[in-house]
């Protein structure tokens, strides 16, 4: 059962200056963790707070990944050679599983052993990336808010078009583990949420470039 918390704000006539550190992007952190997971890799993410993704970490662990806080503001993840599909992922408002992590995790589940079920409880029409993943050989069936993903051994490269921000990130994740060379159009969607994602991935060994 979801807990609803009220916030009451009482204004003042005068405000004073203050210093505040902007929190790191938790969805970007999850996306790069997905990249490590889908490639069987090992990664340390700096400037990331594991406390912000508390609902997602158990999913990675269920898939067989080792995940823990590394230092003051870093996250360590090491993926197994073959991932296990998580049973059910239900999107909910914070602090539960975020809807923006649904598409990236679905891309990972396309090559995991077993079947994963996604239930999208936040937005309608949130499975626009599925048609592109199917073109890569993924096995996904959708009905309403539910998507059932049956893992395959390997995806195949394809010419793809990013449908939206997180869907585009999902295609990048899928392309990293696909056999062959994929191209992804519509990257302006991806640029809205990630700063030079190709440079970040290239820096850790991915064969990726912007054309």
Show where each model-derived region lies:
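Short, structured segments at the rim of ligand-binding sites
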Residues: 1, 5-211
């Amino acid at each position: 059962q979801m807990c609803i918390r009220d916030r009451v704000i009482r204004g003042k006539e005068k405000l004073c200056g203050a210093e505040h550190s902007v929190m790191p992007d938790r969805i970007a952190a999850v996306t790069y963790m997905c990249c490590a997971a889908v490639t069987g890799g090992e990664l340390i993410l700096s400037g990331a707070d594991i406390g912000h993704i508390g609902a997602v970490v158990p999913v990675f662990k269920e898939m067989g990944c080792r995940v823990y806080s590394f230092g003051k503001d870093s996250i360590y993840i090491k993926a197994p050679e073959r991932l296990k599909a998580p049973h059910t992922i239900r999107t909910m408002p914070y602090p539960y599983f975020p809807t923006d992590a649904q598409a990236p995790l679905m891309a990972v589940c396309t090559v995991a052993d077993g079947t994963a079920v996604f239930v999208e409880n936040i937005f309608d029409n949130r499975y626009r990336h599925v048609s592109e993943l199917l073109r890569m050989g993924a096995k996904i069936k959708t009905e309403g808010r539910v998507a059932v993903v049956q893992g395959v051994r390997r995806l195949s490269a394809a010419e793809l078009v990013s449908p939206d921000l997180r869907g585009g990130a999902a295609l990048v994740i899928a392309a990293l583990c696909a056999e062959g060379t994929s191209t992804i159009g519509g990257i302006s969607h991806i640029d809205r949420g990630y700063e030079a994602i190709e440079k970040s991935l290239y820096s850790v060994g991915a064969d990726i470039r912007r054309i």
